[in-house]
Every structure is written in C-alpha cells, then in structure tokens.
Amino acid sequence: MNGDHMVLGSSVTDQKAIILVIILLLLCLVAIAGNGFITAALGVEWVLRGTLLPCDKLLVSLRASRFCLQWVVMGKTIYVLLYPTAFPYNPVLQFLAFQWDFLNAATLWFSSWLSVFYCVKIATFTHPVFLWLKHKLSEWVPWMFFSSVGLSSFTTILFFIGNHSIYQNYLRNHLQPWNVTGNSIWSYCEKFYLFPVKMITWTMPTAVFFICMILLITSLGRHMEKALLTTSGFREPSVQAHVKALLALLSLAMLFISYFLSLVLSAAGIFPPLDFKFWVGESVIYLCAGVHPIILLFSNRRLRAVLERCRSSRCRTP
C-alpha cells in the first residue's frame, strides 16, 4: 500500500475491486515466500560460513527489507478493508505508513547499490576510474548498507512530520474523516511538501539504478557481439549465457520502471482512493515485487541449487 496517500470513507463494494484486493494479497504472499526463501538461504549460508560475498550482503538486505515490506502491505490492506471510514492519518495508519516509508526507501536504495555493485564488477569498461572502483567497491559495502539505512530513516522522518501535521490539524479543527480532502492544510501539505519529498527521495536511487543498468546492459551487449563474431551462433554456451543475462537484466529493469511509475502515479493521487483504478495501481506495484524474487531465484545459480535441494529433500521425505 502506497505510504500515506489514501483518503478513506467508502467501503470496497465493487466486485472487480474486491477481486483485485484478493489478487493483491496473493501477490504479497508470493513476494513473502520468494523473498523469505532468498533471505533464509543466504542467512543460513552467512551463519554456517561466518561470512558472505559483498554482493550477497546487499542482496540479503534487499530481500529482508522487501520481506518485511510485504507484511506491512498486507496489514494495511486488511486494516483498510476492515475500517474503510477511518481517518487516513490516524495513529494506526501513521504507524503502518512509517514502516512502509522506511522499508520502501530501503528497498529502493539497496536495489540501487546492488546495481552499482553488479555494474562495476561485471561491466568490462576500461576507464581508469572504473578499474579503480573494481578494486575498491567491495570495501564500501558496509558504507552502502549504513547509508541506505540512514537515508531511509531521514526520509521516513520527513514523511512522518507531514503526516503528523495533517493529523494535528484534523484534531484541532474537528474535521470529519471524509472531509479531509477539502481541507486547505491537507491539500497544501500533500502538494507542496509530501509529494515533492517523495519525488526527490524516490528519484535519486531510481536514477542511480537505471544509470548502472544502462551501463551494464551496454557492456554485456558489446561483449555478446564480440562473442558472436568468434562463435558459430546463438547455440554456443557463452552466447546463451550472455543472452540469459541480458534478458534477466531487461526484465528486472522493466519491473523496476513499472514499480517506480506506479508509486509516482499513486502518490500523485491519479488513482481514486479505494476505487477500482486504485487497486489496479496497487496490484501493479506488488506484481513487480512478487515477480522480482522469482526471476532472481531462476537466474542465480546458487539460489537455484538451494531450491533444487529443497525439492529433492521433499521428494525423499516419506
């Protein structure tokens, strides 16, 4: 559920909307299962070996934050269905929005730093700065982690200040929950404070992510062209590996675009609250969140091997 931009006051009675709500909850369960599996697999490896690869530390941080985010989304969705006329900035929804804002920002930053790591480590650019980064980047992973937590905490506090100001104004003026949209303080805070802050804080990690994705896809594309010149065609294992990597990167980039655009449209109030279009937007957001770990499971050799071991152990269990 997108942060705090929701004005309640009408129940979900549209049959299509109810179906979308059910789909949204199922997508959350899929995302919880996928992210939970990846977090558990990498967490067990971390405990057994006492260490993880730098990129896996970022990956497990990303998956853990997404895992928690899906639970918050489910909790907020259920609360909205049970109390459709509740004031959108009441303490319960502020508490859920606080968690959602932090976890959403954390997933965006962890995704951006992970794309930086993969870009620097995998891309084959020969610029001196790029080569220098290859040797230094692994040492910066702790800084990436703490910067993600710090930036997410800072932006969450900014969101909380805006949400709490609206709630205090509501208490002072004895407004009705359904009339909050007509209040000038609410309108001013949403348009000139919350929305700009969201755009800035969401766009920064998204821009980093896409710059790195473009560089990485460009590098892999050039490498694949060279491989095609020295091999007999697409059936060669090396070429197929490049094709699979490119397809995985493109699919992840498309999912990230869909996620980001849906967040922006929802924050801008394009989707009417609790209407069919609103739930369409929410479903798109969490469809991306649900598909992403599945792609990762089948594109990562180590995670795929863990999944196969789990399947084989279940088959042997009487």
UniProtKB/Swiss-Prot annotation:
The keyword Cytoplasm does not apply. It is a multi-pass membrane protein. Residues 29-40, 110-128, 205-234, 286-318 are cytoplasmic. GO terms for cellular component: membrane; plasma membrane. CDD domains: 7tm_TAS2R41-like. InterPro entries: TAS2R. Residues 1-7, 62-88, 150-183, 256-264 are extracellular. Pfam families: TAS2R. One of its GO terms (molecular function) is bitter taste receptor activity. Keywords: G-protein coupled receptor, Glycoprotein, Membrane, Receptor, Sensory transduction, Taste, Transducer, Transmembrane, Transmembrane helix. Glycans are attached at N163, N179. Its main location: membrane. Gene3D superfamilies: Rhodopsin 7-helix transmembrane proteins. It is found in: Membrane. The chain crosses the membrane at residues 8-28, 41-61, 89-109, 129-149, 184-204, 235-255, 265-285. Receptor that may play a role in the perception of bitterness and is gustducin-linked. May play a role in sensing the chemical composition of the gastrointestinal content. The activity of this receptor may stimulate alpha gustducin, mediate PLC-beta-2 activation and lead to the gating of TRPM5. Belongs to the G-protein coupled receptor T2R family. Most taste cells may be activated by a limited number of bitter compounds; individual taste cells can discriminate among bitter stimuli. This is Taste receptor type 2 member 60. The gene is TAS2R60.
